[in-house]
Amino acid sequence: MTNIRKSHPLLKIINNAFIDLPTPSNISSWWNFGSLLGICLTLQILTGLFLAMHYTSDTATAFNSITHICRDVNYGWILRYAHANGASMFFICLYLHVGRGLYYGSYVYTETWNIGVILLFTVMATAFMGYVLPWGQMSFWGATVITNLLSAIPYIGTSLVEWIWGGFSVDKATLTRFFAFHFLLPFIISAMVTVHLLFLHETGSNNPTGIPSNTDMIPFHPYYTIKDILGLLLMITLLLTLVLFSPDMLGDPDNYLPANPLNTPPHIKPEWYFLFAYAILRSIPNKLGGVMALVISILILIIIPLLHTSKQRSMAFRPLSQCLFWLLVADLLTLTWIGGQPVEXPXXXXGQMASILYFSIIIILMPLTSLVENHLLKW
């Protein structure tokens, strides 16, 4: 008799995706982040759902409803901080997941990669709208500054911004629609994740060598389920340490002041996970140019498969490309740091240098280095 997990219409989908899935025998812990992202998404949806039961999306009561959640709701404080710091864990896993894809050439599977880039954009949009909901000073001014960037679009810019705001400034209508979208998008993300997995399972996973591993596959369960559980335990430990010991470490103290349209905070900045893009935006003195650089800094991931000039897929055996990759990582960390600094010398000039280096590495240096490596190997 056939096992029910292999014959049942629903169970066999789960079986083929998580149990009997043939997986390369040599994938490292860098392949853990996909499952960690799935767990992050589940955690965010669950904590968010319970927070939404007590939150009110009205300018008069939003800030107080957060206070009410933290003080009066049973374990409301842990829900709130698990949700806020869960977003940080989500982005740490996201950036490591994308970095792994860049290093090991996972972008060669273009459909999976492109859906992943769209997912990245959607998660960023969701996180931005979520940051507005507590209606603190940084929520309000962050929303004002970032939505105002759309006014740089020629001809339709101003109308577009007012349409998004639902008025002539960030107000009640803006908060209500941001809450609606923030609630809806994670479910759309879940559907997109399913498509992402569907395309991945069409080709199978890549592996650290970048060489096809069709002759050496092992079942996902129990080998990689147990390996993913180890990664999960480490992530949960880090998240709980943050939530229980320093829940506000990654937040902004200005967000403990209720939103006041008449008083601008001294330094308006987004959450840490957007600082690299914010630094690129600020490094260009022209508004439209800055907005374009901001969008292109992430959209550039779409063209990565076109810039792949190497005869080898992975960077595992390409020391020159490895040096450039780690230079790119260092550059992104520099941009993140500069994004949190005020716009004055030397931070402004260093941000411009880091922005130029970021685009140069991806568009010019990496493809050229790959060609040099091909030549050195006489390919």
From Swiss-Prot:
GO terms for biological process: mitochondrial electron transport, ubiquinol to cytochrome c. CDD domains: cytochrome_b_C, Cytochrome_b_N. It is a multi-pass membrane protein. Component of the ubiquinol-cytochrome c reductase complex (complex III or cytochrome b-c1 complex) that is part of the mitochondrial respiratory chain. The b-c1 complex mediates electron transfer from ubiquinol to cytochrome c. Contributes to the generation of a proton gradient across the mitochondrial membrane that is then used for ATP synthesis. The cytochrome bc1 complex contains 11 subunits: 3 respiratory subunits (MT-CYB, CYC1 and UQCRFS1), 2 core proteins (UQCRC1 and UQCRC2) and 6 low-molecular weight proteins (UQCRH/QCR6, UQCRB/QCR7, UQCRQ/QCR8, UQCR10/QCR9, UQCR11/QCR10 and a cleavage product of UQCRFS1). This cytochrome bc1 complex then forms a dimer. It holds the Pfam family Cytochrome_B. Binds 2 heme b groups non-covalently. Heme b b566 binds at H97, H196. It comes from the Eukaryota. Disulfide bonds: none annotated. GO terms for molecular function: metal ion binding; ubiquinol-cytochrome-c reductase activity. Its main location: mitochondrion. The gene is MT-CYB. GO terms for cellular component: mitochondrial inner membrane; respiratory chain complex III. InterPro entries: Cyt_b/b6_C, Cyt_b/b6_C_sf, Cyt_b/b6_N, Cytb/b6-like_sf, Cytochrome_b, Cytochrome_b_C_euk/bac, Cytochrome_b_N_euk/bac, Di-haem_cyt_TM. Heme b b562 binds at H83, H182. The chain crosses the membrane at residues 33-53, 77-98, 113-133, 178-198, 226-246, 288-308, 320-340, 347-367. Belongs to the cytochrome b family. It is found in: Mitochondrion inner membrane. Keywords: Electron transport, Heme, Iron, Membrane, Metal-binding, Mitochondrion, Mitochondrion inner membrane, Respiratory chain, Transmembrane, Transmembrane helix, Transport, Ubiquinone. This is Cytochrome b. A ubiquinone binds at H201. Its cofactor is heme b.
